[in-house]
């Protein structure tokens, strides 16, 4: 415990510049970034009861929720989007609700959703 008390005492005596340099060295040594931890820790102190920022979703799953009346058009669009064969695309469409494509960017997910909805399907992004 005496060693820990000495470390605390040494850290307390650092100047702001020395503390910043220490943080930089520790980030390099441990392969981490203190910026996110500092921002989250400083957020509630500065804003009182402010919540931590919500992380924006970057990967989406396009889910075929319902086929609608134009089953053939939806099958064609699923084939174009996924690259599946006719039978595989038909099986996927008939098994709705079913994921069509997983791990895609928001832009690509929106394009796929628009194309499938234009073909007559009901689509969800998750």
From Swiss-Prot:
Keywords: Ribonucleoprotein, Ribosomal protein
CDD domains linked to this entry: Ribosomal_L7_L12
Nucleotide-binding keyword on record: no
Domain of life: Bacteria
InterPro entries for this protein: Ribosomal_bL12, Ribosomal_bL12_C, Ribosomal_bL12_C/ClpS-like, Ribosomal_bL12_oligo, Ribosomal_bL12_oligo_N_sf
MF terms in GO: mRNA binding; structural constituent of ribosome
PANTHER family per record: 39S RIBOSOMAL PROTEIN L12, LARGE RIBOSOMAL SUBUNIT PROTEIN BL12M
Physiological role: Forms part of the ribosomal stalk which helps the ribosome interact with GTP-bound translation factors. Is thus essential for accurate translation.
Name this polypeptide is given: Large ribosomal subunit protein bL12
Source species: Beijerinckia indica subsp. indica (strain ATCC 9039 / DSM 1715 / NCIMB 8712)
Species lineage: Bacteria, Pseudomonadati, Pseudomonadota, Alphaproteobacteria, Hyphomicrobiales
